[in-house]
Amino acid sequence: MRSLSGKMHEVIICEKPKSSEKIAGALFPDAMKKKHGKVSYWEHVEGDKRVTIVSAVGHLYSLRPRQSNEEHFFDLEWAPIHEIDKKKGYVKDYLNVIRKFAAGADRYIHACDYDIEGTLIGFNALKYGCGEEALRKTSRMKFSTLTREEIQRAYKNPIEVDYGQVDSGAARHILDFIFGVNISRSLMKSVKAATNRFIKLSAGRVQTPTLAILVEREKEIRDFKPVPYWIIRAELGEGIIAESKRGKIFKRELVDSILEKCQGSDAEVKDVRVRDTIRKPPVPFDLGTLQSEAYRVFGFSPKKTQTIAQNLYTEGYTSYPRTSSQKLPESIGYEKILKNLAKNPRFGVHIERLRGPLKPHEGKKEDDAHPAIHPTGLLPSELSKDEKKVYDLIVHRFISVFGEDAILQTMKVELEIGEEEFSFSRKRVSKAGWMESYPYTKMEDEEFPEISGGDSLAVRSVSADERETKPPARYNEASLIRELERRGLGTKSTRADIIAKLYDRKYIEGKKIRVSPLGENIIDTLTRYCEKIISEELTRQFERELEDIMRGKISKDRVIDEAITEVRSILSDIEENLRDIGKELYRAYQDSRVVGECPACGGKLVIKYSPRNRSTFVGCSSYPDCRTVYSLPRGASVLKSLCEKCGLPMISYGRPRQRACLDPKCGKKKSEVEEVVGKCPECGSDLIKRSGRYGEFVGCKGFPKCRFTCSVDEVPEG
């Protein structure tokens, strides 16, 4: 059926405005950019065909209960997101453009990102924005980069919409809603029943088991009892330090016996072995390994890395980031990408070293939808400092996977001192290979001493180095993402958001993650009364079933029915212990609000909320007997550090974050509060200890002109 103009009307729907601009420019360079209100769209007319390119802005629709007055919400519907979340009012303008200019077309092309979320975004926009009829006229573009060539190829070779992706995506949203919303409401109801107070609490299908993992580690660290041990070390000539082959020695008497036995003896060289070890090139980045590497190299949070990688993809500089693949198929065009990258001398010097046929060293992980993360060959014209860091990391990784093996040489020397066996080793790179193209790896280059079997070496001293066993290491964001992946919790796209939510809820804090008392008490309470909420196995089961929905092995409705049954069981457990749960949660919440001691009466200073003023403040727990009160600036955080002048807690506030005393009358000026910890390696200004969402960090005083930051533990020397 033709439109009223007599021309066949085709609509291309994209996920985001920037993507729609890229796709319009690649397919129809002379397309006319138009505006309806604040929203842009594109039109192209050629012969008897009219094409309209419109954009979503992420999800246009979200879930809500059909009846908002029910006790529990299991009957849900999709509704425009701006009707549910008032902060999303801007979405209405995009939806209006789709309804006005896309409805009633002859043909639709779904051109959102090719993943579960992208497929669901486009499906809902078409179904609810253009009507059910639109779905029968829809085909799908599949692309992994927003380059002109790939967009044109995807347009000329459309595929069918993957309804397995649609159902899996919809089921995930429904499961997250019925778990998260119902259980969170039930927990808040328990507090209301026990104390007649309202506090905001949050639980989630993946969020709560993740918090439980962190609580388990917190308890392991707290319960750990360090045990002393000794390492016997011998100092020889030429800066050589050899260690006893006994390793850790836990008995002091044995240590004394060994030291006495070694006294006055030379070191006899028993064996010298030099061997070569091949170190293969790294594998291409999937999202998880990119996040881990960016955290290791730059200290970037996984969420920050994911956001930057998405921006680089949208600009057309790198491929789609939310991939599990460590494979680089030949079809991406290795030679063309490398040839274009070589136009930048910084990359060209490394590309020139590549020898022989181009064959990437690939990893085991695969993804049906997208290849590993790689540069497209399009050189950026302008990037922010952090975008440049991530882009360079991706490019160097891509080049290095085609590199030659590196060869590491290891020297192992075994010695005997007074009949006690010692050894030492040295390492050096004999062939750099791929390591020359990947500057983020450490190239060891230790000097090998000229020693042969039978030599006798003078011993300068033999001593015992006393140490203690250490507790398990705290998770950081990168290691937690790896742990969640190992345990099968969450997805590549959601894990960073889950961790960010735990920070936002104040359940965890710090780069080396610590669980707050509130976070720990929530898990302890849930473990006692309704352990199923924190069950990893239940979460894994639903992750497997969501995957099975996508592959057509199980129906969406069956999985949703299973989830409703499980949630009803959890809600029943909470209801049976409603007041006990509420009392414990409220006690934990109250403890988490204590920030110090009242200087007037010795009571507790507590963070409070004023409904009348809609603001938080710090007041004494002994109110009304004690009326000590301190206002808090909007968005302020109370820190653990204390004011050197009056002993009250410090606060951080403003953009960029400033630190000051809780008491504005203290007289502690901002300039006095700033703690200089070094010099910025990029601009030479002072480095200042600051406070932010993840706790304390170090930033350049030259902000915003210089945006250098690092953790408190990584302050550059000099």
UniProtKB/Swiss-Prot annotation:
Keywords: DNA-binding, Isomerase, Magnesium, Metal-binding, Repeat, Topoisomerase, Zinc, Zinc-finger. InterPro entries: Topo_IA (IPR000380), Topo_IA_2 (IPR003601), Topo_IA_AS (IPR023406), Topo_IA_cen (IPR013497), Topo_IA_cen_sub1 (IPR013824), Topo_IA_cen_sub2 (IPR013825), Topo_IA_cen_sub3 (IPR013826), Topo_IA_core_domain (IPR023405). Monomer. Residues 162-571 form the Topo IA-type catalytic domain. A zinc finger (C4-type) spans 598-626, 680-706. This is DNA topoisomerase 1. It catalyses: ATP-independent breakage of single-stranded DNA, followed by passage and rejoining. The lineage of its organism: Archaea, Methanobacteriati, Methanobacteriota, Methanomada group, Methanobacteria. The record marks 59, 172, 176, 322, 505 as: Interaction with DNA. Mg(2+) binds at residues 15, 113. SUPFAM superfamilies: Prokaryotic type I DNA topoisomerase, Zinc beta-ribbon. GO terms for cellular component: chromosome. It is an enzyme of class 5 (isomerase). It comes from the Archaea. The keyword Ligase does not apply. Releases the supercoiling and torsional tension of DNA, which is introduced during the DNA replication and transcription, by transiently cleaving and rejoining one strand of the DNA duplex. Introduces a single-strand break via transesterification at a target site in duplex DNA. The scissile phosphodiester is attacked by the catalytic tyrosine of the enzyme, resulting in the formation of a DNA-(5'-phosphotyrosyl)-enzyme intermediate and the expulsion of a 3'-OH DNA strand. The free DNA strand then undergoes passage around the unbroken strand, thus removing DNA supercoils. Residues 361-380 are annotated as: Disordered.
